[in-house]
Amino acid sequence: MDPHGTCGGSNVPAFLAKLWTLVEDPDTDPLICWSPEGNSFHVFDQGQFAKEVLPKYFKHNNMASFVRQLNMYGFRKVVHIEQGGLVKPERDDTEFQHPYFIRGQEQLLENIKRKVNTMSATKSDEVKVRQDSVGKLISDVQSMKGKQESIDGRLLSMKHENEALWREVASLRQKHTQQQKVVNKLIQFLVSLVQSNRILGVKRKIPLMLNDSSTGHSPPKYSRQYSLEHVPSSTSYPVSGFTDSSAGPIISDVTELPESSPSPSPCPSLEASPSPVILIKTEPLTPSQSPEQSPAPPKLDDTPISPSTFIDSILLETETSVCPGGNKNDEMSESHPPEPCLSVACLDNISLSRQMSEVSRLFPTSCSSVPGRAEPPGLDMAVAELNDHVDNIDFNLDTLQNLLNGQSFSVDTSALMDLFSPSLGIPDLSLPDPDSSLASVSSTPIYTCVV
């Protein structure tokens, strides 16, 4: 028997033909033979089989290669129960089986095919798919990397812009604080400038009607008529609500005056036109007395020149010039001692001609009921000094008004420009103290009106 012979079919692989011959050879039955059923074959003593039989039919004597080829053609190793135990079998027996490898049916060998390496193909396909996926993934990663770099650049730029904005905000806050301080100092400067030139209690010039002076004063901006009188104890004024004659002089607002008539009427001007009465609380200054001034009546000895004494002297002079003495007045002067003048003196703030007409209308010649007094010796000099003082105050007020209206303040503009400079340092201004500007007028007497 030719050990290298092949089976009749040409489609049978050489390994299967050699295997069929090897199993059919009775000389090799001690090492390889069919099973009793004829559907498998047994290999005994693999070491001796590899040394003595394999070199005769194959080009190698490696049992592992022989088993690998069997597995390649679909042969499976049959495992018996006794072989799976812990006790090693006495005989080395390995059984291989294939559905088309049956004793006496050599024609079935054509159906035995070598296994196609589907796993390798599948693996190659999978590898190719994986490579495509990896390539796509790599491209996506690169795209994401580029986007990430762009985002990182934008974030870095935004970070720098944010830092710049914070620095600008800090600078703007400092500038805002600086401007607030500058504005506050400017306001303090303007307020102190205005307060230093302010005169308390002087709102308008008040002309005095003393004697028959030929020099008139300009009418005030807001003219209003007032009447000054002493309130007798026996007379009650329901308008004012004060009946005490010792309350001092009362300034009443003359809102209505009777119209002038050709013939003088007997002095009903006070009763015909009731006027609101204003109580004056005076805190007079102590003027210097003239050595030529004669002593006053006993009632006014304690006060050198009080407001009531000064007004009584003015009223006395007015009554003396308007109402000359008569027989009736002489009789009254003989029977009664001198009393304070109780007539109404019109201290109006209009022109002298209008004042004289009002006085003539209020004090006609036929209505004098009180005798005249002797004029104090130093009255003319006091009146002249008072007129000069009033004119001086009027001139100062006009000058101040022109100064304020003309806006002719001399302000150093360089200091202001330095204040608004972008530098952070704030120059110190030596501004006048607002409280010290009022120190000069703190000693001025204040007349408080209690209505």
Swiss-Prot record:
Residue ranges, compositional bias (Polar residues): 232-246
Keyword Transcription regulation set for record: yes
Record PTM: Exhibits temperature-dependent phosphorylation.
Subcellular location: Nucleus
UniProt DNA-binding region: 12-117
Main subcellular location: nucleus
GO cellular component, one term: nucleus
Bilayer-spanning residue ranges: none
GO molecular function, a single term: DNA-binding transcription factor activity
Annotated segments matching region Disordered: 210-273, 285-307
Keywords (A to Z) from UniProt: Activator, DNA-binding, Nucleus, Phosphoprotein, Stress response, Transcription, Transcription regulation
UniProt record similarity statement: Belongs to the HSF family.
Complex formation: Homotrimer.
Function as written in the Swiss-Prot or TrEMBL entry: DNA-binding protein that specifically binds heat shock promoter elements (HSE) and activates transcription.
Protein name (database record): Heat shock factor protein
Source organism (scientific name): Xenopus laevis
